[in-house]
């Protein structure tokens, strides 16, 4: 019976050391992913804003460098964006690709992307797509 007590005490000691270590490593990994997610969204929004400014000033938004920058920003979304952000982005792109589309509806879909990004980063938000409308670079220069 004494030998079992020693084994139990040893197991408790091992689990007492291993479990906090694993929890700490998991927390560190989640923080690293959250930081990479923020960087991915920041890169996407920066590229998006640069493109919006170019469009508003009738500047060229194509070419090798511009295409590469857009693709790299989208690659980061592919890696780190939530499913809701990717779905909102997909819906916006598909709607924008339609031959005839309403610009107000397109702005609404873009605001839904912004809302999904906020929800992903913050976990929740009390804002609506209407609250984000004035932050849309196509609504306000």
PLM feature spans:
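Conserved non-transmembrane functional hotspots
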Residues: 5-8, 18-141
């Amino acid at each position: 019976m004494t030998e079992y007590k020693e084994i139990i005490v040893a197991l408790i000691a091992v689990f007492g050391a291993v479990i906090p270590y694993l929890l700490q490593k998991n927390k560190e990994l989640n923080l690293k992913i959250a930081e990479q997610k923020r960087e991915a969204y920041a890169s996407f929004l920066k590229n998006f804003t640069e493109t919006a400014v170019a469009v508003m000033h009738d500047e060229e938004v194509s070419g090798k460098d511009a295409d590469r920058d857009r693709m790299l920003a989208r690659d980061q979304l592919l890696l780190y964006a939530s499913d809701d952000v990717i779905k909102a982005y997909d819906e916006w792109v598909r709607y924008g690709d339609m031959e005839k589309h309403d610009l107000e509806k397109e702005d609404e879909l873009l605001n839904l992307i912004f809302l999904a990004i906020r929800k992903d980063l913050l976990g929740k938000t009390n804002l609506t797509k209407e609250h984000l409308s004035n932050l849309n670079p196509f609504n306000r220069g």
